[in-house]
């Protein structure tokens, strides 16, 4: 994915620090969104770059700051599409938060679809079909503030094109999704379409 010396150096430094249980203090200008650290800030800045389109593939949506930046994108005319997995792999309180925030995004004008069959573990944002952010962070507070996570900004045209193609394939096989009311019971189709696995959790 990368041969950028600064990024490779940061990844190696992080591994060494975690291995030795030493503090890790990355610098922001390498294009890596580290958690704990400045990942939330970098993700927000990435969303703010969108002028035409923002494609999102995330299983969880429990972070109000990200919601605010996506709503701002819609207000400035950006087409926002969200691919999620419905309740699959979500547990309370993330299930309630995700349903509520997906509903707000839908009401604001975003297109929300539910993937069918296998879900992706990697989390993806694509801006204007020109740049991507690919990594491990869910949109929730533990992923940003408590766990070691990382995402990478990608600008290589061939890589972004491949990621966009995969997103479009997943979008074409998905269906329009209207999340249930957060404190209500999910519809039967939530179970019938793809059996909920109680042992699976998007961490």
Question: Where are each of the predicted segments found?
Answer:
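PLD/PLD-like phosphodiesterase catalytic module centered on the HKD motif
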Residues: 1-27, 39-40, 53-58, 63-203
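A short, well-structured juxtamembrane/interface segment
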Residues: 35-43
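DNA replication sliding-clamp ring fold and its partner-interaction surfaces
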Residues: 42-52
């Amino acid at each position: 994915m990368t041969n950028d010396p600064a990024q490779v150096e940061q990844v190696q430094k992080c591994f060494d620090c975690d291995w030795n249980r030493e503090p890790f203090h990355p610098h922001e200008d390498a294009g890596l969104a580290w958690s704990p650290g400045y990942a939330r800030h970098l993700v927000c800045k990435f969303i703010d770059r969108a002028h035409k389109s923002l494609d999102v593939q995330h299983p969880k949506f429990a972070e109000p700051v990200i919601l605010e930046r996506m709503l701002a994108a819609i207000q400035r005319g950006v087409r926002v599409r969200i691919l999620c997995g419905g309740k699959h792999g979500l547990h309370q309180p993330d299930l309630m938060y995700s349903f509520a925030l997906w509903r707000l995004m839908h009401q604001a004008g975003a297109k929300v679809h539910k993937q069918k069959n296998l879900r992706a573990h990697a989390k993806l944002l694509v801006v204007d079909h020109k740049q991507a952010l690919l990594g491990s962070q869910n949109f929730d507070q533990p992923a940003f503030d408590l766990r070691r996570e990382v995402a990478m900004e990608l600008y290589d045209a061939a890589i972004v094109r491949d990621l966009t193609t995969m997103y479009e394939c997943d979008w074409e096989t998905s269906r329009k999704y209207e999340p249930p009311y957060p404190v209500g019971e999910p519809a039967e189709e939530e179970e019938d379409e793809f059996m909920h696995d109680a042992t699976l959790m998007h961490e």
